[in-house]
Amino acid sequence: MRLIQLWILLMVSGMCFAQYSDHQLYQAYLERDMRVWQEHIASAEWDSLSIEEKKQLLNYEYGFTAYMLGQDAHEAQRLIARYEQHLNALKEQLPAARYHAYLSSIYTYRLGLDRKHLMKYASKIYDNINLAMDLDDNDALVCAMQGNVEFYSPFGSKKQALEYFQKADSLYRSEAKLHEKWNRCAVQLTLVQCLIKLDRKEEAKGLCAQYIAAEPQFELMKQLLPQCD
């Protein structure tokens, strides 16, 4: 009887974070089925997770919160608070560069919901991403976030953004972590968008076709292809 109880306990504790596998979450990202991400994040019991599982969940929260900014401002506000709470809980376990890169994204999300405080948030965004780059400019996530800052900021440089995206793509390719495959696809998407903005549409079209050939279910990339003409 005790063995059965132990088996049930182990099964339940494992389910605290394993509602969806990294592969399923990656496929959901490609197919733009973010309901899967929402269910996965909502079902995770933070206190029951290992440090590594918490780090992986934080990365999914980073991505899903960005998605929700364009869907539901009230829910996005709640997710930002949760994301920040989890980031603070992992401050000592994360590499310092990643901590400051994630913190930069939190201020970016807040700015997305509160344009009245542009200068306040912009300063914190740049301070944290610049510090992250100083600490480790060979971290793929850090490079990708620096690229995002350059790409989306009205004061940024699309040319520099492209260089950061290219470097991040290369770093993600060499690291090949399943739970970060979606991050690489996000980088590839903004890389193509950056080429379009720089009026390098032939190059953008070639890369776009290449990425779709590699991942035929990549919906956002397929939607981007007509913009390359």
Task: Spell out what each predicted region is.
Residues A42-W46, E84-N88, E92, D127-D134, ...:
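Amphipathic alpha-helical segments of tetratricopeptide repeats
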Residues L178-D229:
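Terminal, low-structured helical/coil segments at or just beyond the last alpha-helical repeat
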Residues Y20-Q24, D47-G70, L94-L113, D137-P154, ...:
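Amphipathic alpha-helical repeat scaffolds of TPR domains
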Residues I106-S153, Y164, A168-S174:
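Eukaryote-skewed repeat-based solenoidal scaffolds used as protein-protein interaction platforms
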Residues L25-R35, T65-L79, T108-A122, Y152-L162, ...:
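Short coil/turn connectors between adjacent alpha-helices in alpha-solenoid helical repeat scaffolds
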Residues R2-L9:
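Sec-dependent signal peptide recognition
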Residues S13-C16:
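N-terminal signal peptide c-region/cleavage motif recognized by signal peptidases
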